[in-house]
Amino acid sequence: MTTPFVLAVPSKGRLQENAEAFFARAGLTLSKLGGARDYRGTIAGLDNVEIAYLSASEIAAQLARGTVHLGITGEDLIRESIADADKKVALIEGLGFGGANVVVAVPQAWIDVRTMADLDDVTTGFRAQHNRRMRVATKYINLTRNFFAAHGVVDYRIVESAGATEGAPAVGTAEMIVDITSSGATLVANGLKVLDDGVILRSQANLVASRAADWSADALETARVILDRIAARARANKYKEVRTRFAGCDASLLTEAHNRFGVVSPFGGPTSSGMITLHCPPAQLYALGSFLRDHGADTVSIASLDYVLDRENPLFAKLESFLRQ
């Protein structure tokens, strides 16, 4: 029996909803085997794929161990929980949801502390005055240590946080925090501010590949199929299809359209009758339409694209390159 290809997906909340919607847009329908409470699932039409519904943090751990081939999780969890992450996993594609920043935040009352250099001065002075180090509340222990070391900040100690990190300075369990934030509103509500150069990581959900997984020929082919559909949808999102026909449509006009509007002609130049199909960035549609009509087109049609399949698949090429390293 062939070993299944394992794809790990967040098991609850907005991340699960967004992940399933992402795959659905690529024509990959996920379903749970035993209903909403089951933690196993399938993809319609791909019988050898097993969906593992896990927490985002567990997905990062399983990617490191190689028990899943691909998984969706936040880059913050990858960077925090996997040492030398770039050698063990590959971030195949940022997915545009689950966005948040890991930041260094200090009390707003520290009006003279705006940068990491200022923080270095304050922590050194604090230790000299109080004979102890400043406390940093965080669950991002490794990211904090690496970032502080890169900025030469050494006079601090980490207080591991399991709950509402942003409240630690107010209740006196820490002087400052490192935490993840989307809008910053919660930090402000707790009397905190982000240092000007205190963004450690701009994170989002990623489709991640594991080096340690069993990448058999069958597994690679399954990955190619999945990534081909994702890439086809991503290409379609970049463009609208523009079609027209007029006698003055020639190669020089297409070159000008490409240079001015970023269009591509996926099927080559115009036919003998002047028929042409173009792919155009959405922001340039009306400018391109005016340009074509100014040069002789009577009618220009514009349509949305569902998928654009291409011989080259940059996502699968990225996976292959990573596995060869």
Swiss-Prot record:
Reactions accelerated catalytically:
1-(5-phospho-beta-D-ribosyl)-ATP + diphosphate = 5-phospho-alpha-D-ribose 1-diphosphate + ATP
Q: Name one Pfam family in it.
A: HisG
Question: What GO MF annotations does this protein's record show?
Answer: ATP binding; ATP phosphoribosyltransferase activity; magnesium ion binding
Q: Write out the GO biological process terms.
A: L-histidine biosynthetic process
**Pathway info:** Amino-acid biosynthesis; L-histidine biosynthesis; L-histidine from 5-phospho-alpha-D-ribose 1-diphosphate: step 1/9
Cofactor(s) this protein cannot do without: Mg(2+)
Q: Which GO terms describe its cellular component?
A: cytoplasm
Record carries keyword Cytoplasm: yes
Coiled-coil ranges from the UniProt annotation:
none
Domain of life of the organism in this record?
Bacteria
Report the SUPFAM superfamilies cross-referenced here.
Periplasmic binding protein-like II
Give the E.C. number(s): 2.4.2.17
Check the record and name the Gene3D superfamilies matching this protein: Periplasmic binding protein-like II
- Major localization listed first in the record, in broad terms: cytoplasm
The record's similarity note reads: Belongs to the ATP phosphoribosyltransferase family. Long subfamily.
Q: What is this protein called?
A: ATP phosphoribosyltransferase
